[in-house]
Regions:
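Helix N-cap at the start of a conserved alpha-helix in ABC-type nucleotide-binding domains
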Residues: 119-121
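C-terminal boundary and immediately downstream tail of ABC-type ATPase nucleotide-binding domains
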Residues: 172-211
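Conserved ABC ATPase signature
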Residues: 83-87, 91
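Conserved ABC transporter NBD signature motif
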Residues: 5-13
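A short, proline-enriched helix->beta-strand linker immediately N-terminal to the Walker B motif
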Residues: 102-106
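Catalytic Walker B motif of ABC-type/P-loop ATPase nucleotide-binding domains
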Residues: 108-111
Length: 211
């Protein structure tokens, strides 16, 4: 329990909730960890079934059916009986996504989802997260330092600097922001400096067309 203050979730103070209320609320939240956090001793199918068996009273057959559906949704076939060590890092991440959506959550929290992945796989994971977010009407919150992800799929963007909310906006506004700390972080590389100039030009064209 915190020493002071409140933690508000959907208008409710969770610090005053009972253990059973917290468990019920937990079913509304999916978690995608930085390192996938799969159980080495469980098969791919077993990993996705875990939250269903832990947090629901569904039958084994029902849990298995839901887990198989989630694995198909993340485009994984023929790996259900394999163990995490027998599949690639990108496939492990997709297993973790399948597990995160198994309980059909309202919210999906992702911690550095592209960590350790090659650029091509990172794009595939970004697209998968974006598709699932819109398909199932989930609010997805992604903590990332990967500006490719921010620019690629970010819709409502919050820039946290030294523990404080420094800036809030969308992808278009990133390229026209005068916030010095944001610019130093986003456009630290030569590539993004060049992209910034191009995007500002495109943004201005778009603004002119709307007038």
């Amino acid at each position: 329990q915190p020493d002071k203050g409140q933690v508000i979730y959907d208008g409710r103070d969770i610090t005053s909730m009972s253990a059973s209320q917290i468990k019920e609320l937990r079913n509304e939240i999916g978690m995608l960890f930085q390192g996938s956090a799969l159980f080495d001793s469980e098969t791919v199918l077993g990993n996705v079934m875990f939250p269903l068996r832990m947090f629901t009273r569904d039958t084994y057959a029902s849990c298995k059916k839901r887990a198989e559906f989630c694995l198909e949704r993340v485009n994984l076939k023929g790996v259900n009986d394999l163990y995490p060590s027998e599949i690639s890092g990108g496939m492990q991440k997709r297993v973790a996504i399948a597990r995160a959506i198994a309980l059909n959550p309202k919210y999906l929290f992702c911690d550095e989802p592209n960590s350790g992945l090659d650029p091509k796989t990172s794009i595939l994971i970004d697209e998968l997260l974006s598709d699932i977010t819109h398909e199932y009407n989930i609010t997805t919150i992604i903590n990332t330092h990967d500006m490719n992800s921010v620019i690629g799929i970010g819709e409502n963007i919050v820039f946290i600097n030294k523990g404080h909310r420094e800036w809030v906006g969308n992808r278009a506004k990133i390229f026209t922001s005068s916030n010095e700390a944001l610019n130093d972080f986003v456009f630290a590389t030569r590539l993004f400096k060049e992209v910034k100039g191009y995007m500002i030009e495109e943004y201005r064209k778009h603004e002119s067309a709307d007038e």
